[in-house]
Amino acid sequence: MDVKTAFLHGELDEEIYMEQPHGFEDKRYPDHICYLNKSLYGLKQSPRLWYIRFDTYVLSLGFVRSEFDACFYFTQLENDPVYLLLYVDDILLISKSIIKIQKLKKDLSREFEMKDLGKARKILGMIIERNRSDCFLKIHQKPYLEKVIAKYGNMNSKSVKVPLAPHFLLSKSQSPKTDSEIVRMETVPYANVIGSLMYAMISTRPDLSYAISLLSRFMSNPGMDHWLALKHVVAYVKSTLDTGLCYSKRKDVLELVGYVDADFGGDRDCRKSTTAFYFTYGMNYISWKSQMQSIVAMSTTESEYIALSESVKEAMWLKGLLSECKLCDSSPIVFSDSQSALCLAKNPVYHERSKHIDIKYHFLRQHVETGDIKLLKVGTEDNPADMGTKVISSTKFKHCLDLLFVG
């Protein structure tokens, strides 16, 4: 569902004045200003006021607001619960009961001017495809990515199998240095393409996570080598427009499982490492991240330990969200291919080589000791998080995507 003129529903809680709109001045009082009774588009307060207005009404209907996501609401969970997700003025309703959904639609339409878009087929540029007979659902962004490619031209017609190739050894030393190089790169839509692909990456394309994470480090001053690497990513996207997230009933027991990995000193400029983690629920992909670490790790063990700590933060948030809906009772399982990092997390003994690690990363040990999280070993060849930390071969890349049911 879509809320029409959502920001106009907000109730102002302070005095705000504005000039009379051009063309609508009062002939009797042309020098007067207007006192606002309701919020308007353009006010910095409008988004917040709209949210407060919506939140107050939804709670009055008996919904519970999630403690882990302020835009996620649900009803009592005993009998066919209803889930409501809000994104600004776009609303998704989920329930097994059509009657409950229809009633909620009527309640919302009575309070706000709504547009009923029917069954969810598209939201925020994401296409939702269902096959109910096979209990299969796929989310992809093919139309959005086609528009991106059309907007920025056919930058590379060559078909490629991986987002980045091994010969792209990128660093800030490749940034433009002369005035002519700077002027030349000013005509290149580097940041625009990165931003467009980043939206796809965080929504439905985890296969782009490492490439976009790496290339975004050069957005302030990209060089021609960076641009050529980005064109390679676009060529990969053009070759894989149908790729998306595939969901189905793959296991009878729904478990929250994560995979984590880190390179060591992979950044060629500052020698910081890269963390990557990927989470599944019932063997269905739900969360991912590839990001450069904030500090320089002094060993492979340290970089893997930091990555484990970051992944556990995500695991605890996901567990809280799922437990709140009574969808997850067991402790999350996180797999790592670093035996030394796992030992450091499970057996927190004093060690000369690890005593310097910042205390903020050691909260991982607390969750391991209390049983809130389970850490297990996985072989490097079967760790899909490997694709989020470095450039890998096309064979290994496809294997990682298959492990996560991305296709």
Language-model-detected regions and their locations in the chain:
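Metal/cofactor- and membrane transport-associated sequence elements
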Residues: 1-113
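Mobile genetic element proteins and their domesticated derivatives, centered on retroelements
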Residues: 2, 18, 42, 54, ...
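C-terminal reverse transcriptase regions that engage the nucleic-acid substrate
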Residues: 40, 88, 116-245, 379, ...
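Polymerase palm active-site segment centered on the conserved acidic dipeptide of motif C
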Residues: 64-68, 93-145, 150, 327, ...
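Secondary-structure capping and boundary motifs in well-ordered enzyme cores
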Residues: 76-80, 182-193, 201, 222-225, ...
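RNase H-like nuclease module associated with reverse transcription
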Residues: 122, 127, 218, 255, ...
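RNase H-like nuclease fold core
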Residues: 197, 258-301
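Structured nucleic-acid-interacting core domains from mobile-element enzymes and related host factors
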Residues: 235-260, 326-327
